[in-house]
Amino acid sequence: MSSLRQIAFYGKGGIGKSTTSQNTLAALAEMGQKILIVGCDPKADSTRLILHAKAQDTILSLAASAGSVEDLELEDVMKVGYKDIRCVESGGPEPGVGCAGRGVITSINFLEENGAYENIDYVSYDVLGDVVCGGFAMPIRENKAQEIYIVMSGEMMAMYAANNISKGILKYANSGGVRLGGLICNERQTDKELELAEALAKKLGTQLIYFVPRDNVVQHAELRRMTVLEYAPESQQADHYRNLATKVHNNGGKGIIPTPISMDELEDMLMEHGIMKPVDESIVGKTAAELAAS
């Protein structure tokens, strides 16, 4: 058996991270790879397109019902979906209570101890990435995820999140084996999006693995709780996800330690591409009336 690849998809909330990851993993499964998805997002939507389900029961909620994690069996928490992809959701605490990261690491330890990682080619962690708090950085900190793919777009906040996630990877890169595999741009059809994605990848010292074009077939598939590969396998969009999966598959061992940039450098990059205009310091803090009078 080939060595296990532990990859993770990080990205700003709402960027299409879970959709991109599930379509990519479905394409890897089509290629004959054995996949385990470990959802680490409190929304517990990391497996819905694979399982055709609203939200999978999470390890934490099942453990709470059973008494403790020790009272669970692997078959209680693991579901098998499209192309025999195995699916688990770690879950998180109630909003405002506790740390989601603790749930993530509890879940990963439970899965490892109960043989979930046996006879698997890829374990994929789907992780919320707006906040690189200690909790959501768990798969990186604990040296579980070795290869990080950041899903982003040409929007400033998505690039800001990608840069922040890179800072988290850099922090743990030397103590563990974690590396940045590359950026995946999920097109939002903003100005100069491809140019910006490539420019950010260059600044971070990595590569733009793939530019996924926007297509309404993705939404049509999502409404049916399906991946594009299952819903419309002959579509051009399905082929884009297959191409992305091939790029990821061929990228093993090629990850880098990123070189994150400052907020000023990020803004300079946006100005260079004409997305942001330099701020006229003389107008900062002035009301509309004051500006009209000046």
Swiss-Prot record:
InterPro entries: NifH/chlL_CS, NifH/frxC, Nitrogenase_Fe_NifH, P-loop_NTPase. Keywords: 4Fe-4S, ADP-ribosylation, ATP-binding, Iron, Iron-sulfur, Metal-binding, Nitrogen fixation, Nucleotide-binding, Oxidoreductase. Its cofactor is [4Fe-4S] cluster. [4Fe-4S] cluster binds at residues 99, 133. Coiled coil: none annotated. Binds 1 [4Fe-4S] cluster per dimer. The keyword Iron-sulfur applies. It catalyses: N2 + 8 reduced [2Fe-2S]-[ferredoxin] + 16 ATP + 16 H2O = H2 + 8 oxidized [2Fe-2S]-[ferredoxin] + 2 NH4(+) + 16 ADP + 16 phosphate + 6 H(+). It is an enzyme of class 1 (oxidoreductase). This is Nitrogenase iron protein.
